[in-house]
Structure formats: C-alpha cells, structure tokens
C-alpha cells in the first residue's frame, strides 16, 4: 500500500474531484445534524474551506491528516489541492458513509479512520520514509482541521507536548498544522507579550512554534451558527525550542505564573514551592532568573520564562522532592488534617 502511496507522491497529474452532491445535499441525504455535545459546526462554503487549505501551503503530492472531517467540506478542498494521501480521523459514525462516497470519488487518495483524534496514534498512520531530520525542512506532511470547540484546547496542548518530545505526528519531523479555534483561543495562541490576551497558551505555543494568525471566519458562515467567530491558525515547529527544559516542567512554571493574571508574577510563581519554604525558594528562583517579581504575568517574555524554567530546574536538581510538589495537593491534605485532627506530614518530603 505504501508503495502505491509513494508513487502517488512523486510527479502527479493535477486532480479534481468529479461532480458530487453539495455538502448541503450530503447533510440532507444522510440526515446529518450537528451535535451540540460534540461542539459541531459545519462549514458549507467551499470558498472558505479552500482558503483554509491555502494557509497550509502547497499540498501537491503531500500527505495530510484531517481532524474531524464531518460532512467533508474541508476534505474536498484538501483533495482538490492535490494531496496524494489524505487520512481523515472521524469520531462520529454518522459521517462515515458521506466520507466513503468521497473516497470512491478519489480512488487511492482518501483513507478513513473511525476513531478519536485524542487517542489515535498518528505516528503509525504514515510511512516512515516521509520523515525528515528535525533540523531540516519540515516533512511533506500536514495536519489540517476545523476543530470542534470542546476538543481544540486539549488537543493543541497534547500536540505541543508531542512536539516537545518529537513523538506522535512529530516523529516524522517538524510537521505543520493549520487549525481552526474559537476566535478568543486563536487570539490567545498568537498574543504578544503585554497584550490583553497573553496567557499560558500563548507561551506554551510560542516557545515551541512559529504561530501565525491567518484570518477570521465569521460565525454566520457555519451551520449551526456558533455564538463566536472562528480564527484560523498556522503552526510551524521551531528547529530549536526557545526553552530547553522538559515540557512538563515548562508547563508547570507557566501555569503557576498565570495563576493570578492581575497580580505580580511572584504571587503565582511562589506556589511552585511548599509553604514552609515558599518565600526563601521563590526569592532564590527569581533572583537566579533575574526576573523582577513585580512584573505582571502578561509582561513576562519568552526570555523571562526560559530563565525561570532554568532556575526552577536547578532548584529541583538540588532538591528532587520539589518537582513532585503541587500546591493544590498541599491544600487538600491541609483540609483533611483540619477535619480529622491528624498531625500534618511534610509535603512533599524534601531535602535540606
């Protein structure tokens, strides 16, 4: 099968789908309705789906994974853009017959996986021969999707962790992503330092990727119409992350920094440490990182976060118990102790 696919990814004739029922007709034909619980919103205007696909770059001969194709509007645009191998991952059984119709219209080009993108092993979905070394140009593999709102944030966090670890879709190299998000989430992903929308998501995405806001789709373009507009965002993983620490450690530092958005950054950062040693260790970390404790979280640059992550990693290497510490767990134990009257054990058991 891979041989046929690789032959297809060489020099290919331009491909256009044959005449097909419109997306609206497919929805009627298979009695499809958007499910509110799955945050489904259909994009019926093929001019808009074509515009999304153009943001991914040249797809002629490319391998593509589409997330949540639904009735197949974006799928058609990807196929018409010349993708040689399109793998679609769809959780909702109702959409499979319509996608099979498309598969028959594009022989050998469309593969359908009935499954959940949050658990699907994309590293097994494409041939290893398409891989590129991380430091070189990105592989000819793209992830494209009109994401349901309820899955978009957990999914991009999961993919950012895969990116940091070079696993999943990024086992092939610096795989590019073109995805839709609620406009507010898109703004957070691309927000610059000191902007109102700057958040944990901004820092986590931007330390690993070049993140580009492409364009906004008005809510009225979707069926059913969501209450918000939608932003299209393109991600290209960086050859060298801007913070050279494990993803979980970076995420913990950034999450704590944004714990109190409107207060000085030290208020959230000190919660990285057990209460008994909090002032001492927080001061040591901020001093070592050369970060002004009175900056607001939104004012911290990627350089600040790099210095903070490095300083925190240094403290954890001196006292390994710090890495396991979570302030919410200490609060939970305190509540239990208040109820039962038991003496409080040290949390976590730390060195001197």
Locate predicted features.
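An accessory alpha-helical subdomain
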Residues: 228-231, 235-237, 243-292, 297-304, ...
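Catalytic cores of RNA-modifying enzymes
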Residues: 2-256, 307, 311, 319-325, ...
């Amino acid at each position: 099968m891979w041989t046929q696919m690789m032959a297809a990814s060489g020099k290919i004739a331009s491909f256009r789908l044959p005449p097909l029922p419109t997306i609206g007709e497919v929805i009627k034909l298979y009695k499809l309705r958007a499910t509110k619980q799955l945050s489904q919103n259909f994009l019926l205007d093929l001019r808009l789906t074509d515009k999304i696909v153009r943001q991914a770059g040249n797809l002629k001969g490319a391998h593509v994974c589409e997330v949540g194709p639904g009735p197949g509007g974006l799928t058609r645009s990807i196929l018409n853009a010349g993708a040689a191998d399109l793998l679609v991952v769809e959780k909702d059984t109702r959409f499979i017959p319509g996608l099979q119709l498309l598969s028959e219209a594009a022989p050998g080009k469309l593969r359908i996986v009935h499954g959940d993108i949050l658990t699907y092993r994309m590293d097994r979905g494409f041939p290893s021969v398409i891989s590129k070394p991380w430091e070189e140009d990105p592989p000819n593999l793209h992830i494209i999707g009109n994401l349901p709102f309820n899955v978009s944030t957990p999914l991009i966090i999961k993919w950012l962790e895969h990116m940091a670890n070079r696993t999943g879709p990024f086992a092939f190299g610096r795989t590019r992503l073109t995805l839709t998000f609620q406009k507010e989430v898109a703004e957070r992903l691309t927000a610059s330092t000191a902007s109102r929308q700057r958040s944990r998501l901004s820092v986590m995405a931007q330390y690993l990727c070049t993140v580009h806001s492409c364009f906004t789709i008005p809510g009225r373009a979707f069926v059913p119409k969501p209450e918000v507009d939608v932003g299209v965002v393109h991600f290209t993983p960086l050859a060298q992350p801007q913070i050279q620490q494990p993803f979980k450690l970076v995420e913990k530092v950034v999450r704590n920094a944004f714990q109190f958005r409107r207060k000085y950054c030290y208020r959230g950062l000190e919660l990285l440490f057990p209460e008994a040693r909090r002032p001492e260790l927080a001061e040591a970390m901020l001093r070592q990182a050369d970060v002004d404790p009175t900056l607001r979280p939104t004012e911290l640059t990627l350089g600040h976060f790099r210095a903070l992550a490095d300083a925190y990693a240094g403290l954890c290497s001196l006292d390994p118990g710090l890495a396991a510490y979570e302030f919410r767990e200490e609060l939970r134990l305190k509540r239990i102790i208040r109820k039962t009257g038991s003496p409080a054990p040290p949390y976590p058991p730390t060195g001197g």
